[in-house]
Swiss-Prot record:
Provenance organism: Cenarchaeum symbiosum (strain A)
Subunit description: Part of the 50S ribosomal subunit. Forms a bridge to the 30S subunit in the 70S ribosome.
Gene3D superfamilies: 2.30.30.30, Nucleic acid-binding proteins, Ribosomal protein L2, domain 3
Role noted for this protein: One of the primary rRNA binding proteins. Required for association of the 30S and 50S subunits to form the 70S ribosome, for tRNA binding and peptide bond formation. It has been suggested to have peptidyltransferase activity; this is somewhat controversial. Makes several contacts with the 16S rRNA in the 70S ribosome.
Protein name in UniProt: Large ribosomal subunit protein uL2
Annotated GO MF terms: rRNA binding; structural constituent of ribosome
One BP term from GO: cytoplasmic translation
GO cellular component, one term: cytosolic large ribosomal subunit
Length: 243
C-alpha cells in the first residue's frame, strides 16, 4: 500500500509541519489606540524573535503599556516613537496614511484599519506613498504592484531594519535547515522522480523519469495532485523572431 505524498501530509497541517512557537516573543502589532489619540513611547530594548529576520523594538508608553513593533533603520534604545495623526514625519513614527506626503517610504502598513500592521513587514522592506485621491491612498508595494488603502490605515515611516540578511550566504546545509525550520518550511526538498513508487506518483523505475504527463488537473484527487498543477503551458518558452 502506498503512502500519502508529502505535499498532502503538509496540507493537513500536522504539528510537524507547523512553525514552532518556541522562541516567539509577541505579536508585532500596533497598540489599539483611538484614531485621534496622540501617544508617545520609548524604545527600551531591541530583541530578536525566532523565525523573524527584522528586529523587534520593545516600546513602553507613559501609562505602562508595553508593545512590540518591527524596528526601522536608525532605531536605537532610548529613542522615542510617536503614534497619532499629528506626529512628525520622521522615521519610526506611526501615522495614518492620509497624513503622509507623497513619495514617503513607509513600512508595517495596515491592510485593514485596526489590524495593527499586516503588509510590508519583511526585513529591509518599504513601500512608497504614491498618491492621495477620493478612492483612498495609493501605495507602491515592494513587488511593484499598487494597492489602494483606507486613508485611516496606519503606517510606520521609514525602512525596516535587517535588509542585508538575504545577502548572507549559508555556509552549511545544517544552517539552512535550521533557518527553514524556524519558519516552518521544508528543507531539503527531494524530487519526486528520486523517490520510491509507493511514496510519490513520479517515483520508481530503472532510471529517474516521470513516466507520464506531469501536468495534472486542478480537480485531481489529493494523492495524484503533484507536478504541474493546471499548467497553461509547459516546456521551454519560444523566443519570437523580431527581425
Amino acid at each position: 500500500m502506498g503512502k500519502r505524498p508529502l505535499v498532502r501530509r503538509r496540507g493537513r497541517g500536522g504539528m510537524q509541519f507547523r512553525a514552532a512557537t518556541t522562541g516567539k516573543i509577541a505579536r508585532a502589532k500596533y497598540p489599539a489606540f483611538e484614531l485621534g489619540e496622540q501617544r508617545e513611547g520609548t524604545v527600551i530594548d531591541l530583541v530578536h524573535e525566532r523565525g523573524r529576520d527584522a528586529p523587534l523594538a520593545k516600546i513602553r508608553f507613559e501609562d505602562g503599556i508595553v508593545s512590540y513593533v518591527p524596528a526601522v533603520l536608525g532605531t536605537r534604545v532610548g529613542s522615542s516613537m510617536n503614534f497619532g495623526l499629528k506626529s512628525e514625519i520622521r522615521d519610526g513614527n506611526v501615522i495614518s496614511v492620509q497624513n503622509i506626503p507623497d513619495g514617503t517610504t513607509v513600512c508595517n502598513v495596515e491592510k485593514h484599519y485596526g489590524d495593527g500592521g499586516a503588509i510590508v513587514k519583511s526585513a529591509g522592506g518599504n513601500a512608497t506613498v504614491f498618491s492621495h485621491g477620493e478612492g483612498g491612498v495609493v501605495l507602491k508595494l515592494p513587488s511593484g504592484r499598487f494597492s489602494t488603502l483606507n486613508p485611516k490605515n496606519r503606517a510606520m515611516v521609514g525602512t525596516l531594519a535587517g535588509g542585508g540578511v538575504s545577502e548572507r550566504p549559508f555556509m552549511s546545509a545544517g544552517g539552512k535547515w535550521r533557518r527553514f525550520r524556524s519558519k516552518g518550511r521544508k528543507y531539503p526538498i527531494v524530487r519526486g522522480v528520486a523517490q520510491a513508487a509507493y511514496v510519490h506518483p513520479h517515483g520508481g523505475g530503472r532510471h529517474q523519469h516521470v513516466g507520464q504527463s506531469s501536468t495534472v488537473s486542478r480537480n485531481a484527487p489529493p494523492g495524484a495532485k503533484v507536478g504541474s498543477i493546471a499548467a497553461r503551458k509547459t516546456g521551454r518558452a519560444k523566443i519570437k523572431d523580431r527581425r
